[in-house]
């Protein structure tokens, strides 16, 4: 305020402007809840009766406990106990002692008695997601859902979470081809492209496949390959110029993520 005091956002009549569209935001929240809660039921059914769930069958208990330990050390409870001067032995005892707590479930909150350590394993069972919708013309964010439940899971999957970019990375390979003199009308045979394990430093030979066989053994243009997201075309470009050239171009364009220079980059396998 002009007099040096802080504004009260609730009582001082401030106006908050946002690009969020309330109708789209409502649809986004409802859509995420409907879809993820349905997937969660399928997930429960899949792992029912399996003692190590939701971890792979070949995981040893030491590996599972290590994951739980990591979750424990990243928790707010652990940080507060460390700040209070508790030893690791004392903290472990506290985390294994049952206390009253409230847990998240898609059917509503559950009031129960559980050890903090067991609650971490319980929470590890949930499928998470986030979504953001942006107007491509203005860049305005119209809907934003960071996770399945802010009260219980304060991790923002939109801003912080990492995910494979997939086919959205393919235009970078086409850009490289154009940069190197290829025309959008340049034709490429739509046949399997094999990356030899010895030449490319792989464990075994690798030949990426297309999602369908509608255009098998046809000559297709770069333009058509991009429009239809055909894997064998980006694999062909990758084999012509190599992964280092692709990474260099991505960095020049402005991608700041760590990108491994490997053949599978042609399918957008990095986070």
What is the meaning of each model-derived region?
Residues 1-201, 210-211, 223-224, 236, ...:
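Extended, non-catalytic substrate-recognition/exosite surfaces adjacent to catalytic cores, especially
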Residues 30-34, 231, 252:
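Residues within well-ordered alpha-helical secondary structure of globular protein domains
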Residues 160, 230-231, 255:
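A broad detector of the eukaryotic-type serine/threonine protein kinase catalytic domain
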Residues 202-208, 242-271:
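Mid-domain, small-residue-enriched loop/turn segments at the edges of structured enzyme/sensor domains
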Residues 208-242, 250:
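Metal-dependent DNA phosphodiester-chemistry modules and their immediately adjacent helices/loops
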């Amino acid at each position: 305020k002009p007099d040096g005091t802080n504004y009260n956002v609730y009582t001082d009549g401030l106006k908050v402007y946002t690009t969020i569209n309330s109708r789209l935001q409502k649809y986004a929240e409802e859509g995420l809840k409907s879809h993820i809660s349905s997937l969660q039921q399928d997930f429960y059914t899949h792992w029912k009766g399996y003692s190590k769930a939701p971890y792979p069958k070949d995981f040893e208990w030491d590996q599972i406990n290590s994951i739980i330990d990591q979750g424990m050390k990243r928790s707010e409870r652990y940080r507060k106990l460390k700040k209070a001067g508790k030893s690791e032995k004392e903290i472990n005892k506290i985390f294994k002692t049952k206390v009253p707590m409230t847990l998240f479930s898609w059917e509503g909150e559950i009031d129960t008695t559980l050890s903090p350590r067991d609650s971490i394993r319980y929470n590890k069972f949930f499928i998470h997601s986030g979504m953001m919708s942006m107007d491509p013309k203005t860049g305005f964010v119209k809907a934003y859902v960071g996770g399945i439940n802010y009260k219980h899971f304060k991790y923002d999957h939109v801003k912080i979470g990492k995910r494979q970019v997939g086919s959205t990375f393919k235009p970078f390979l086409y850009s490289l081809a154009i940069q190197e003199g290829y025309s959008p009308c340049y034709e490429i045979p739509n046949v399997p492209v094999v990356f030899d394990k010895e030449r490319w430093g792989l464990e075994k030979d690798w030949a990426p496949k297309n999602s369908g066989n509608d255009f098998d053994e046809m000559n297709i243009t770069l333009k058509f390959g991009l429009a239809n997201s055909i894997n064998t075309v980006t694999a062909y470009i990758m084999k012509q110029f190599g992964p280092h050239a692709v990474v260099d171009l991505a960095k020049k364009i402005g991608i700041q993520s760590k990108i491994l220079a490997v053949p599978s980059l042609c399918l957008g396998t990095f986070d």
